[in-house]
């Protein structure tokens, strides 16, 4: 009988023969969009996070250090995933009794905010004004984002977040810079760095993304200049070389770099051919001759070969020399192991200002910085002094360069070519490598000795740190290892306004740092601590340098924003939030301050990366014990979220329409190690899952509404057997749930909770229990035993779900725990200690068998119902034939077996064969009890109550029925 039907029946009969149908203030409808904001306000008003911390005072700390989101724009679904995952971990760890600390943070400096200030107020503002407006803008953005994060049910120290723009944090960042300078990691040099013309600044590796780009691909000939050396290398007469024009041919997809060419590269071990063609002699890699001649539409014959090593230092004319005397220079061949013969001619042209390998090759051959030709300015335009192309942007110059090469007679082929190319992640525009004078943290420099002993390089220290770190999922370790192993020096400097200054004084003539730089940095940091980075702008050098001020100038570079967030283990954990986050015991143990860093998979090259490098320089260790990575959100078809596609999902919209609890349950039920798919259809399924869990909770709370554990608790030995089984099953599941939480695995917890609610409880235990709960005497031992089990199940279940269904668990807890020590909130309690059941293993095995029998019985009952012979299962009587342990289990229940199988009678006999299970269903010939709806022979045995069966008569007016098993 359904609860609704019983309620209607009870009402219609005016409780003539009442059943124990109780109610609860916990409603069936969650009405989440309306109720959740009330919970958020209540948590804020009673300072819930502070209460939780107070309850855990003195406990071991668990520190999840927040990777700061950028203070610009509304939060998106990726932010929601990130914050909910963090919140679930903090709550799950807190429920173990740990002092789980969460201080949210924001990344505040950098280009995106500068762009917003330019949009609102125009370009050309004084630096101080830009900084003031940027600070105000970031503050406003943080307020907006904070509201949305709290709306998601995320608990943390929202009253005291950390901000990279806080004066103290800015000052401590300068102190961190001073520290790594003293240790010998920082140097200044000319190097090609990732450069964005729109940013007007160098970019970090993490700020570069790759997209397809269509470029002009060209094959360019560099005319022979040293025939005698070529003749010697190829072992042919010099007259043969001189007899015809000749070129060494290169292939490139960046025509704009040709004006800056200063060398050519060949592989020392590759064989190169001197090829005779109708156009003249060509030098190509031997294995590329056939393919390249087709491209050039030429016939040809190899007349000699030589290794790349034999061609070393031979020089060739610049291909634009005939067009303008400014290009009248020679390009030597340098050997390079990186040259391949997969595509092109097997020869690479080298413009050291615009390629990392080009630069390294030319520097290795003694080219001084002053000789490097670098005509491209920071805005992507050639300097006006560049012959032929001065004043043009490099992209506009590409076709002009091709025309000039054609006119000079040195172009062999040009065509459009699609390839993966570097783009700025902010502007989505192509970027280049550009040699500029920058400040670097050297990956392979030898740091200063400590205590007279050599210190490993930054690369070595960081790689060792990775080996000492736990990764969730495990594949993250190799990914980060590969990035660190292969990365170039870290470009620390940026050419921006809204950022922490690299507050150095540089000698005007020599470019050398002031000899008292560490001391001066501390003096500047003290000013920044009081006035913010603006203090550097207003500082008169004479205040610190005295008479030397005229010899020095302020360095105008700012620090990479990845240094801002990458040093928060120093500026926040050891600095501004030391009282909350710093754990001296962890520091003394191994120096790793945070238990966990958790971010999206892009942060292997972002925050995980920069934090590892800064901590390796400062302490020689990572700042974290473990790294957890989550995937990106995609739509139901696996496509990335994109405004242009129109498939973006707003967490604010979901919270307002369905409830933040639905976002939380979606995050928890998804395997975050891969992509997280979200769509309307997926969210509908999540809503259904939520309803099932909520309905289970409502049933539990309703049937516990007259239960007081202090008065009605019974020892486990006095419970019915099925109750002991249900609690044993709960205890078994609790071990699995806590094990998953310990490993940061949430989707198995949700899956098991759903199965527990729908199959173990709704599909079995609660289904069996309804008769006992509703029909036995209210204060009978049989009913109180059932309530004992429900109490323990509810305690455990509310704690399992609290980390992800926080609003719902808290709402249910207020009903369930009313009047207890933890009435205020579930989050100051700990995971429930589910009582031990002595015969748990035997019970679990026995009732597993009984449930298998029940499943077969249900199938047989359904077949008979479909035939129209019965309506409900209570109209049926069963005869079951079984053997072996199955027979033993069935017989052990006696008359209680009918309650387990939801029939009015169940008879068990031995089967002909031990392994048989035969079920016979017979429609009952007896009358139906008006109260319990069972069909029994004793209905009407008491003439005073002719519509009641014997047990209902006894439960209402006599001593009550006796139950042992179910």
UniProtKB/Swiss-Prot annotation:
MF terms from GO for this chain are: aminoacyl-tRNA deacylase activity; ATP binding; isoleucine-tRNA ligase activity; tRNA binding; zinc ion binding
Give the protein's cofactors: Zn(2+)
The record lists the catalysed reaction(s) as: tRNA(Ile) + L-isoleucine + ATP = L-isoleucyl-tRNA(Ile) + AMP + diphosphate
- Class of enzymatic activity (EC top level): ligase
Entry superkingdom: Bacteria
Q: Which SUPFAM superfamilies does its entry note?
A: Anticodon-binding domain of a subclass of class I aminoacyl-tRNA synthetases (SSF47323), Nucleotidylyl transferase (SSF52374), ValRS/IleRS/LeuRS editing domain (SSF50677)
Entry's EC annotation: 6.1.1.5
Q: Give any single GO term for biological process.
A: isoleucyl-tRNA aminoacylation
Q: Which residues bind Zn(2+)?
A: 929, 932, 949, 952
Comp. bias (Basic and acidic residues): 1-16
Report the residue ranges where the short sequence motif 'HIGH' region is annotated in this entry. Answer: 69-79
Cofactor comment text: Binds 1 zinc ion per subunit.
Where, by residue number, does ATP bind?
A: 643
- UniProt keyword list: Aminoacyl-tRNA synthetase, ATP-binding, Cytoplasm, Ligase, Metal-binding, Nucleotide-binding, Protein biosynthesis, Zinc
Q: Which residues bind L-isoleucyl-5'-AMP?
A: 599
Entry-linked InterPro entries: aa-tRNA-synth_I_CS (IPR001412), aa-tRNA-synth_Ia (IPR002300), Anticodon_Ile_BEm (IPR033708), Ile-tRNA-ligase (IPR002301), Ile-tRNA-ligase_type1 (IPR023585), Ile-tRNA_ligase (IPR050081), M/V/L/I-tRNA-synth_anticd-bd (IPR013155), Rossmann-like_a/b/a_fold (IPR014729)
Annotated spans, Disordered: 1-24
Q: Where is this motif: 'KMSKS' region?
A: 640-644
Q: Where in the cell is it found?
A: Cytoplasm
Record's comment describing the protein's domains: IleRS has two distinct active sites: one for aminoacylation and one for editing. The misactivated valine is translocated from the active site to the editing site, which sterically excludes the correctly activated isoleucine. The single editing site contains two valyl binding pockets, one specific for each substrate (Val-AMP or Val-tRNA(Ile)).
Q: How the protein assembles, per its UniProt entry?
A: Monomer.
Known role: Catalyzes the attachment of isoleucine to tRNA(Ile). As IleRS can inadvertently accommodate and process structurally similar amino acids such as valine, to avoid such errors it has two additional distinct tRNA(Ile)-dependent editing activities. One activity is designated as 'pretransfer' editing and involves the hydrolysis of activated Val-AMP. The other activity is designated 'posttransfer' editing and involves deacylation of mischarged Val-tRNA(Ile).
Q: Which family does it belong to?
A: Belongs to the class-I aminoacyl-tRNA synthetase family. IleS type 1 subfamily.
Q: What is this protein called?
A: Isoleucine--tRNA ligase
Source organism of this protein record? Cupriavidus taiwanensis (strain DSM 17343 / BCRC 17206 / CCUG 44338 / CIP 107171 / LMG 19424 / R1) (Ralstonia taiwanensis (strain LMG 19424))
Q: Which gene encodes it?
A: ileS
